[in-house]
């Protein structure tokens, strides 16, 4: 299991991202093939598919930042190596599986702390009714899913998407902030996102990662986790617990309206 890498979605310095997220997976896969390892699971990111409406397990990618670009190259390197192994060394070719993690939240993660701060502020908001699927997930469920894949008795797909944990953009904001988010008109949110991407483009995509985070916070993103559901590989959802813990860690007083929830 390769979970090594550089988890820095807002980082603009490409060389270290390339080394950790693109080169290292290839090195590990080659080492696995040479030492007789039978199954290799590489932890990638759903960010490789960018702002597409529904995340899935296809090879289609749309990187939008230095981080997602480096993760995409890591996946492409593994897919090319898989073809090479099967063609040149079929007897020792390891089974390669790319696991695309969604927006993983956990104790001590900078992204989780920032989300909790935003959700706890007067600026907490969602687009429209806020019923879009949120890709936020817990590190606990991800770890459990990794074990499920590692011990799966059948053949794994080349790419697998981490299963949805049931959160909507409204419920995720509520859990992380312990206050009801504002419901903004969808047209206003779309206009703001479009303007944000335009400004980022003028500045060499410097703010693309941040704009994308706001877009996901407002609208969410569809998740096609049909393979995991078909095979009953569904870890215990714990994202609500993680988000509420993140809010508590901020040291803010709990809203009286949610004292018993």
Task: Pin down the residues of each PLM region.
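Mid/C-terminal beta-alpha module of Rossmann-like enzyme folds, strongest
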Residues: 145-208, 237-261
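SDR active-site strand-loop-helix element
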Residues: 3-4, 40-46, 99-101
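Flexible, glycine-rich beta-alpha linker
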Residues: 49-50, 94-115
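Conserved Rossmann-fold NAD(P)-dependent oxidoreductase catalytic core, especially the SDR/UDP-sugar
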Residues: 26-66, 86
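Substrate-positioning beta->alpha
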Residues: 109-114, 128-150, 157
